[in-house]
């Protein structure tokens, strides 16, 4: 009898343990599902914020989508892990969010900017940094660094602070080169769209305005190696009018 009770007690303990394991597994699935939902909502919120900036500059079309895809691709080419690539895919499209604070008279002016107007335009990186710095989340922190530094140049000729070399965060350097590539490939009222080959020639060899010295050397090398994928991304998310 005692032996039977012992067996029943052991079976009861085993069933309890299995029930606890099943409950824990169910909780983990629920938490995982919740986390996926939060991440999806977070990504959509970031996309909405980026789109809000682009409404100030409607010529850009699919630009914000391409920038994220380019940046993630380039991060992968540089050996970044999956999490880092996903972070910059979400963060890089926010690079121009500071334009929401730029007056339309300056931002949408069709002719060349005056010195005073260009000085106003050059404030948008700092405006973007102020907007994005309200959050301490890693993606937002990265986005704030990108917004502030994506117009800096490796040789120190950029703005707003004239940083050079390793003073510039690598995520900003990645965004810089993909932003230049996309601008070269895109049609604008003041210029035609360039082919992939033409854009690569300007980035790698320079054209007077753009120089290889503007770009972080390891980022430039990785970009050259990943250029076919960059071309594919552009073709996949091409502006409707092109």
Regions found by a protein language model. Give the residues of each.
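Metal-dependent catalytic cores of enzymes that make or break cyclic nucleotides
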Residues: 15, 33-37, 43, 50-242
């Amino acid at each position: 009898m005692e032996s039977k009770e012992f067996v029943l007690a052991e079976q009861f303990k085993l069933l309890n343990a299995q029930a606890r394991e099943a409950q824990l597994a169910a909780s983990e699935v629920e938490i995982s599902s919740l986390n996926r939902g939060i991440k999806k909502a977070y990504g959509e919120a970031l996309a909405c914020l980026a789109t809000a900036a682009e409404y100030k500059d409607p010529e850009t079309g699919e630009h914000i989508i391409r920038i994220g895809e380019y940046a993630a691709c380039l991060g992968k080419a540089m050996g970044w892990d999956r999490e880092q690539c996903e972070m910059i895919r979400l963060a890089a499209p926010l690079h121009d969010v500071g334009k929401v604070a730029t007056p339309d008279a300056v931002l949408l002016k069709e002719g060349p900017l005056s010195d005073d107007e260009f000085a106003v335009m050059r404030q948008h990186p700092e405006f973007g940094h102020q907007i994005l710095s309200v959050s301490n989340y890693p993606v937002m922190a990265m986005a704030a660094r990108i917004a502030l530094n994506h117009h800096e140049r490796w040789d120190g000729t950029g703005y707003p602070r004239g940083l050079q070399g390793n003073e510039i965060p690598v995520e900003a350097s990645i965004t810089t080169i993909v932003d230049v590539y996309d601008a070269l490939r895109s049609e604008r009222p003041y210029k035609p769209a360039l082919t992939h080959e033409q854009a690569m020639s300007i980035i790698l060899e320079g054209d007077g305005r753009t120089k290889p010295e503007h770009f972080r050397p390891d980022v430039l090398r990785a970009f050259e190696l990943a250029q076919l994928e960059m071309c594919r991304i552009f073709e996949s998310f091409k502006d409707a009018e092109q």
